[in-house]
UniProtKB/Swiss-Prot annotation:
<keyword id="KW-1003">Cell membrane</keyword>
<keyword id="KW-0472">Membrane</keyword>
<comment type="similarity">
    <text>Belongs to the UPF0161 family.</text>
</comment>
<dbReference type="InterPro" id="IPR002696">
    <property type="entry name" value="Membr_insert_effic_factor_YidD"/>
</dbReference>
<dbReference type="Pfam" id="PF01809">
    <property type="entry name" value="YidD"/>
</dbReference>
<dbReference type="GO" id="GO:0005886">
    <property type="term" value="C:plasma membrane"/>
</dbReference>
<comment type="function">
    <text>Could be involved in insertion of integral membrane proteins into the membrane.</text>
</comment>
<protein>
    <recommendedName>
        <fullName>Putative membrane protein insertion efficiency factor</fullName>
    </recommendedName>
</protein>
<keyword id="KW-0997">Cell inner membrane</keyword>
Amino acid sequence: MSLPRRAAHAAIRAYQLTLSGLVGRQCRHWPSCSAYADEAIQRHGLWAGGWMGLARICRCGPFGTHGIDLVCEALPEGAAWHRPWAYGRWRGVNAPAPLGE
């Protein structure tokens, strides 16, 4: 794991162990936004994963999305370093298909 990924993981983990308890564990998604951002950074790197985490945090609000939202396995098509907003999913969730389908 690269140094930037380790630093991001340490910062997220510090937030989870300190401020998250003070703010309250009231995330509208599963996994929580901090766990989602940590997984996205570990899976896709600091640049792409950081943008994915930011998009998730922006969706987590009273009028945003809720429920199961997993980190995608592959980066979205059309995402590139010079178009960082394309890494994030700004609407909707990435949930598994219902069991009957």
